[in-house]
């Protein structure tokens, strides 16, 4: 019986373990943690014949010390660094090593896939695509970074029409044969440099997904894409919220002509009106860009405009992405916890009604904060800083001459203080848009957003 070792006991790792066990592999799982939740999962999987080793820092020697067979295959969960020296060693010894998404692809590649990547916008675009496909009567669940883990779909074994996958750079680099029918690139700006090292490396990892996609769709409004990639794929579809042409920003080259664009209040495909932009409930120009990309996917998948219009008009938005929580004393409280980098936070702040009270901070990331700081100066009546980045953010604000900030440290204090300040500042919005990861105070950005939502709902009751 061939042996496989899975690194990581999260949702994707659990599904991968069960899938491989069903396929006849001798499966072991390792995780460096040892929480109560992991112990409970360890017991559950043990009852299924899948041994789990906690407090295990992966290496081939560590597996040998546990008397585990040398694995024929290693499957890596998305959060595990692909360049981990122990993984490099395994690959050098000829052990097949890849990610959970690659495993799912190998099990589900008989179906057409939509693969959606990008620094920002990929989750919302994925959710709109899923809604459109559902309105068209297609069995096309979203997976990857949204909805199911990809291996959960494979494990379920249900017949599908399409697989719609939100794909991160972490998943792309560990999925060497993933080849979607339709590949989408929403935006590009520096992110995850602590893992990928350079902007160029990050860009090339993202580009791999489109290189291997049969049909390609890119956002022509995004400067990171239009400046760096206009002619890499001559057959690509481009979108534009500015009509049937792109700004002359293609590094001296002639810009590609958009196939899907907004004109006279309509999303048009090759000039044909498909859906009115005003039927979409979500805020912001960036969500118009997401809509365009989703309509482009639907068009290439052969979905009619009636299903598109129905899905768009009823789509409620996505949790933690400019999610309207409540209106309290005339002030809108908005959850944008998914804004984990400067570009996303700048976009969120620009989209809400001003003057706004901004709640920002968390675990800081490397990136260019200039546009974000400029938008704060223009839109924010007050900035309330939380988390480990609060001190550094206060220094950045002070350096640009912006003094309307307070360090409040925690979300509880931030929401309470925002409610106190809103009347005197005549604020129209209180926005959580952190520009940071969440891991200093929360397990993930969803937990952070859930906490903010609960505090706002308590306030309004």
Swiss-Prot record:
Keywords: ATP-binding, Cell cycle, Cell division, Cell shape, Cell wall biogenesis/degradation, Cytoplasm, Ligase, Nucleotide-binding, Peptidoglycan synthesis
Task performed by this protein: Cell wall formation. Catalyzes the addition of glutamate to the nucleotide precursor UDP-N-acetylmuramoyl-L-alanine (UMA).
Enzyme category, top tier: ligase
Residues at which ATP binds: 118-124
Cellular location(s): Cytoplasm
UniProt record similarity statement: Belongs to the MurCDEF family.
Catalytic activity, as annotated: UDP-N-acetyl-alpha-D-muramoyl-L-alanine + D-glutamate + ATP = UDP-N-acetyl-alpha-D-muramoyl-L-alanyl-D-glutamate + ADP + phosphate + H(+)
A biological-process GO annotation: cell division
Gene, per the UniProt record: murD
Pathway: Cell wall biogenesis; peptidoglycan biosynthesis
Taxonomic superkingdom: Bacteria
GO terms for MF: ATP binding; UDP-N-acetylmuramoylalanine-D-glutamate ligase activity
The keyword ATP-binding belongs to this UniProt entry's keyword annotation: yes
Name listed for the protein in its UniProt record: UDP-N-acetylmuramoylalanine--D-glutamate ligase
Gene Ontology CC annotation, any one: cytoplasm
């Amino acid at each position: 019986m061939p042996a496989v070792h899975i690194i990581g006991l999260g949702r994707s790792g659990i599904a991968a373990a069960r899938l491989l066990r069903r396929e006849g592999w001798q499966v072991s799982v390792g995780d460096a943690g040892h929480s109560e939740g992991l112990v409970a999962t360890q017991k559950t999987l043990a009852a299924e014949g899948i041994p789990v080793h906690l407090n295990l820092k992966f290496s081939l020697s560590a597996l040998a010390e546990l008397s585990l067979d040398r694995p024929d295959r290693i499957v890596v969960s998305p959060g595990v660094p692909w360049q981990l020296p122990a993984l490099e060693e395994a690959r050098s010894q000829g052990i097949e090593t890849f990610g959970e998404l690659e495993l799912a692809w190998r099990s589900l590649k008989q179906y057409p896939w939509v693969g959606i990547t990008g620094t920002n916008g990929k989750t919302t675009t994925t959710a709109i695509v899923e809604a459109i496909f559902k309105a068209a009567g297609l069995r096309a669940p979203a997976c990857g970074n949204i909805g199911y883990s990809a291996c959960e779909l494979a494990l379920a074994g249900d017949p599908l029409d399409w697989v719609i996958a939100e794909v991160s750079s972490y998943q792309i680099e560990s999925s060497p044969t993933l080849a979607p029918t339709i590949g989408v690139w929403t935006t590009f700006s520096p992110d995850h440099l602590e893992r990928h090292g350079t902007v160029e490396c990050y860009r090339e990892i993202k580009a791999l997904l489109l290189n291997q996609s049969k049909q390609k769709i890119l956002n022509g409004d995004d400067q990171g894409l239009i400046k760096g990639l206009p002619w890499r794929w001559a057959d690509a579809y481009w979108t534009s919220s500015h009509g049937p042409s792109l700004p002359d920003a293609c590094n001296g080259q002639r810009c590609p002509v958009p196939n899907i664009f907004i004109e006279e209040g309509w999303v048009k495909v090759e000039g044909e009106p498909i859906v009115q932009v005003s039927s979409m409930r979500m805020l912001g120009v960036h969500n118009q860009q997401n809509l365009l990309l989703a309509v482009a996917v639907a068009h290439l998948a052969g979905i009619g405009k009636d299903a598109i219009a129905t899905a768009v008009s009823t789509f409620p938005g996505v949790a933690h992405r400019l999610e309207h929580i409540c209106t309290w004393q005339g002030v809108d409280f908005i959850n944008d916890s998914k804004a984990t980098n400067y570009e996303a936070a700048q976009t969120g702040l620009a989209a809400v009604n001003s003057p706004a009270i901004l709640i920002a901070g968390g675990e800081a990331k490397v990136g260019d904060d200039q546009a974000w700081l400029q938008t704060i100066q223009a839109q924010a009546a007050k900035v309330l800083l939380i988390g480990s980045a609060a001190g550094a953010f206060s220094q950045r604000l002070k350096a640009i001459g912006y003094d309307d900030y307070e360090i409040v440290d925690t979300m509880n204090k931030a929401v309470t203080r925002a409610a106190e300040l809103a009347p005197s500042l005549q604020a129209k919005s209180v926005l959580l848009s952190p520009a940071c990861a969440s891991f200093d105070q929360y397990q993930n950005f969803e937990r952070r957003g859930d906490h903010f939502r609960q505090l706002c709902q308590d306030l309004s009751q």
